A protein has these predicted regions:
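Condensing-enzyme catalytic core mediating Claisen C-C bond formation in acyl metabolism
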Residues: 1-44, 142-210, 215-218, 248-268
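Claisen-condensing/thiolase-fold acyl-transfer catalytic domains that form or cleave C-C bonds
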Residues: 2-24, 52-55, 78-79, 88-123, ...
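Short acidic, glycine/serine/threonine-rich loops at helix termini
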Residues: 20-22, 83-85, 135-140, 191, ...
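N-terminal, Lys/Arg-enriched amphipathic/low-complexity engagement segments
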Residues: 37, 41-44, 49-57
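Phosphate/pyrophosphate-binding loops at sites that engage ATP/ADP/AMP, CoA/4′-phosphopantetheine
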Residues: 54-70, 208-222, 290
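Anion-binding (especially nucleotide phosphate/pyrophosphate-binding) glycine-rich loop
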Residues: 66, 71-72, 76-82, 88-91
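Short, well-ordered, mixed-charge alpha-helical segments that flank or form enzyme active sites
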Residues: 81-82, 132-137, 173, 185-190
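Flexible, glycine-rich active-site loops centered on histidine and acidic residues
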Residues: 122-155
Length: 290
């Protein structure tokens, strides 16, 4: 899809936990919180607090009030999107809940762009979050169990990223334009190892990237970088091989947010970072400002 009147990104903000702040991108985040519970009683409440912090920082950076937001496109990893529901209730704006797992920020930005380009509003907020402890509790093993993590496993990021999207750049201060996008399909190679999500996601990433290049009649060299959310080290290796089999070489310009946000050697994060907050925080703090 191509947007005839490309929406623009006015501002972006990021809030992360202490481990993320100690990683390679630590200096770029707007706020690094040392308390893993963000002053709250539960992991879920912590994530809600983190998401609201990111949203409010983005709104302030854009020079807007919450009342000017026509829509919120937001999501997290928890059941019923409870981090989003309880976190953004204070904004008192219409919400579209988005559950795209690790692709949530990309999906939210695309949906926001479609709404604004279609004339449904002037401003939208795309925000997502994840929390290591909340994700482990819901999807993997209780933290006190102390299970062994294979090297193919990723580490769920404690982080949130928020992006303000506008129908037009009235002040000439936009960070970027969203000129178009390619929604991905569900591609299943039958990988059943929940501790190797990079291998599970790589085929879909390959399909989306190659379809995008075909749709827009472009080559990888037309882009400064081709960025994925959290394939991690193993997923990246699979992606590069699959893309090459389809006639494209992206090895010299592919970046993965999960590989950028942590140092796997010093931080023991194995294959890299993951979760809704991984791509969102990395995009907001490191990629968009650059």
């Amino acid at each position: 899809m191509i947007f005839e009147k490309p929406p623009v990104i006015l501002a972006a903000s990021s809030v992360v936990g202490e481990k993320e702040g100690q990683g390679p991108l630590g200096q770029y985040f707007d706020h690094v919180e040392k308390d893993p519970k963000f002053g709250m009683e539960t992991w879920e409440q912590a994530e809600s607090t983190m998401q609201l912090m990111a949203a409010e920082k983005a709104i302030k950076k854009a020079g807007l009030s919450k009342e000017q937001l026509d829509f919120l496109f937001a999501g997290d990893l928890l059941g019923q999107l409870i981090a989003t529901s309880f976190g953004l209730i204070e904004l008192e704006r219409p919400v579209f809940g988005v559950y795209g797992a690790c692709s949530t920020i990309g999906e939210s930005l695309l949906l926001a762009s479609m709404a604004l380009c279609g004339g449904a509003g002037n401003y939208a907020l795309a925000v997502t979050s994840s929390h290591f402890a909340g994700a482990e509790k819901q999807f993997r093993f209780p933290l006190p169990y102390g299970n062994q993590r294979p090297l193919s496993a990723t580490w769920t990021v404690v982080g949130s990223g928020a992006v303000i999207v506008a129908a037009e750049d009235k002040k000439g201060k936009a960070m970027a334009k969203i000129t178009g996008g390619t929604p991905g399909r569900i591609i299943d190679f039958g990988v059943k190892d929940s501790m190797n999500m990079g291998a599970c996601m790589a085929p879909a990433a390959c399909d989306t990237i190659c379809q995008h290049l075909k749709d827009f009649n472009r080559q990888p060299t037309d882009y400064d970088a081709i960025i994925t959310g959290d394939l991690g080290k193993i997923g990246q290796q699979i992606l590069l091989k699959l893309v090459k089999e389809k006639g494209y070489d992206i090895s010299d310009r592919h970046l993965d947010c999960g590989m950028l946000i942590f140092d796997p050697e010093s931080q023991d994060t194995h294959a890299g970072g993951s979760g809704c907050g991984c791509a969102a925080a990395t995009l907001s703090a490191y990629i968009l400002p650059a």
